[in-house]
Amino acid sequence: GYFMDPTNKHMSSLLLKCGLPGGMMGSMMADLKGVHSGINLILRSKNEPELSIDDLLVMLFDEVEYVWPKLGYPPLVTPFSQYVKNVALMNVMSLIKGEERWTMIDNHTWDMILGKSGRLPGALAPEIIALAKEKGYEFTDEDPQKNYPDQLDEYRKEMTENSWDFGQDDEEL
């Protein structure tokens, strides 16, 4: 928490175009630095010019701008902004390797796409819907809160059994 890469503040204005929150800059740069050498290794093996970290950052922002509407315009707040960034980064890596987009989507992102986190503000792109069907995934429009039943009575019982203080109101539980 105390160290911030000094280059982050110089590049954060690039976030305006793709819409990602500025608070993601540190983790995003760490992700990029983590894959940078691997990407350049792939490019060298294909006799293609290597990318600077700045070039890679611009590619990532362009890909975020591309994937965000295709994923139904999820709100770019935690955790959805990370999902969008992760899909974009995986797409960039896939494209550099000569593969197609959408080959590496993690389970949390699929849960968002399928509606398990609630309805997305926009429509999913037909290619995303087709990919989900191809994988045998099912979409849902159920209330995501049903996945988290009220357990307040269980917590009260546990607190009583352990002689723990209940606090001043239910919010403190």
Predicted regions and their residues:
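A structural-propensity feature for long, helix-poor, extended segments
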Residues: G1-F3
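Terminal or standalone catalytic/regulatory effector modules within metabolic enzymes
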Residues: K9-L173
